């Protein structure tokens, strides 16, 4: 049985094996602690039998006005637990919090342009490629900014794709 619950400080010492995947972005401990302190509603872990960490999602809410949105900073599932709809459950949880609690207009995320399996999964979940960010990742790899409109964005303005790629310095952070 899988349990999804809020991430805790103790989990920081238990989730290293999930981060070993080469497609998973990893961060330093203070980065995780900042998210845990500032956006605890957006940080969840999935546990299996024996309290084994199966995956996690980490995000935040940010922006102003019609740019108010939920953001998926990281979502990852350990290879042995993939293809069990776990990432979908974690994504749905973050989307629900963004939509129902924080009344966001959309949820966004960044994904490596080469990570075809993740892109396909996000598209199945209703995300669209909003824009390409040139050289977003280390190694000069492009990133794709993917978005999904939430119920507050009745006209779906937040998911009208941009016509041209942008550079990282053109990104706006709130």
From Swiss-Prot:
GO molecular-function terms, A-Z: protein N-terminal-methionine acetyltransferase activity
The organism's place on the tree of life at top rank: Eukaryota
Domain N-acetyltransferase: 2-151
Reactions catalysed: N-terminal L-methionyl-L-asparaginyl-[protein] + acetyl-CoA = N-terminal N(alpha)-acetyl-L-methionyl-L-asparaginyl-[protein] + CoA + H(+); N-terminal L-methionyl-L-glutaminyl-[protein] + acetyl-CoA = N-terminal N(alpha)-acetyl-L-methionyl-L-glutaminyl-[protein] + CoA + H(+); N-terminal L-methionyl-L-aspartyl-[protein] + acetyl-CoA = N-terminal N(alpha)-acetyl-L-methionyl-L-aspartyl-[protein] + CoA + H(+); N-terminal L-methionyl-L-glutamyl-[protein] + acetyl-CoA = N-terminal N(alpha)-acetyl-L-methionyl-L-glutamyl-[protein] + CoA + H(+)
InterPro entries: Acyl_CoA_acyltransferase (IPR016181), GNAT_dom (IPR000182), NatB_acetyltransferase_subunit (IPR051646)
Disrupted gene: phenotype observed: Reticulated leaves, early flowering and aborted or unfertilized ovules in siliques.
Pfam families (alphabetical): Acetyltransf_1 (PF00583)
Gene3D superfamilies: 3.40.630.30
UniProt function note: Catalytic subunit of the NatB N-alpha-acetyltransferase complex. Involved in plant immunity through the regulation of SNC1 stability.
Protein name: N-terminal acetyltransferase B complex catalytic subunit NAA20
High-level lineage: Eukaryota, Viridiplantae, Streptophyta, Embryophyta, Tracheophyta
Name of the gene this protein is made from: NAA20
């Amino acid at each position: 049985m899988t349990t999804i619950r809020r991430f805790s400080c103790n989990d920081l010492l238990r989730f290293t094996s999930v981060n070993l995947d080469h497609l998973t972005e990893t961060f330093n401990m203070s980065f995780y602690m900042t998210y845990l302190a500032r956006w605890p509603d957006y940080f969840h872990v999935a546990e299996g039998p024996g309290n084994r960490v199966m995956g996690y999602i980490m995000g935040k809410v940010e922006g102003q006005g019609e740019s108010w949105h939920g953001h998926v900073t990281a979502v990852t599932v350990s290879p042995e637990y993939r293809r069990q709809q776990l990432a979908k459950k974690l994504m749905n949880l973050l989307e629900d919090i963004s939509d129902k609690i924080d009344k966001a207009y959309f949820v966004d995320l960044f994904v490596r342009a080469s990570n075809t399996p993740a892109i396909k999964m996000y598209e199945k979940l209703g995300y669209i490629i909003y824009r390409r960010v040139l050289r977003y990742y280390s190694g000069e790899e492009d990133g794709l900014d993917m978005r999904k409109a939430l119920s507050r964005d009745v006209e779906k303005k937040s998911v009208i794709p941009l016509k041209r790629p942008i550079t990282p310095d053109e990104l706006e952070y709130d």
